[in-house]
Amino acid sequence: MSRYLCALAVLAVISVPADVLAQDRVWNRYTLEGLGGVFVRTEADDPCESVGVTRRDVQADAEAILLESEVELLTEGEMLRNPALPELRITLECVIGEGDGASGAVAYSVSVRVQQSAQMTRNSQISLPEAVTWWSTAVGVAGSGNVKTALEEDLRVTLEEFATAYIEANTEEDDSGGR
């Protein structure tokens, strides 16, 4: 069964167009504008933990990357007091290959998404506490000895993509014509 899941993950990597793996477009960056920061929450499933990719390490690495990129980080309390409830959710999932041909391989996905409170324009009485307004996903396959490095690299690239979008959405443009 795991052999088929690994094969499916490889096929998914090959067949998914690059623009489907991320939703970072000019038209949706405005949803990051004025958030005032994000609370970072990480999730890693048991197979990821078993190959050395722990939720705690991912949380620390993610926060370091975001701070270095000058993205404001919120505590959980600050996030709950913010009307947007801005959360950057990082989810890592792994499938460990078993049997002929898949033994020693690990298929993985790294998902980074911004969730925030949203209100329906057609009826302001309807609000959603967790609407995904920005996301990016990376998928890959690595040998069990290299999965931690591969996952960390994909996470870094994905977080840098978010940081760029966030900073650009929250940087005021100079309207003075450079004077």
Predicted segments with their positions:
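Surface-exposed short loop/turn segments
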Residues: 69, 79-133, 141, 145
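Bacterial N-terminal signal peptides
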Residues: 6-16
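Positively charged n-region of N-terminal signal peptides that target proteins for export
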Residues: 1-5
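C-terminal/domain-edge helix-coil "capping" segments
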Residues: 23-30, 121-179
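A structural detector for beta-sheet-dominated domains
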Residues: 33, 41-45, 74, 91-95, ...
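A structural "domain/chain start" motif
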Residues: 18-60, 168-179
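N-terminal, post-signal-peptide region of Sec/Tat-exported proteins
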Residues: 51-82
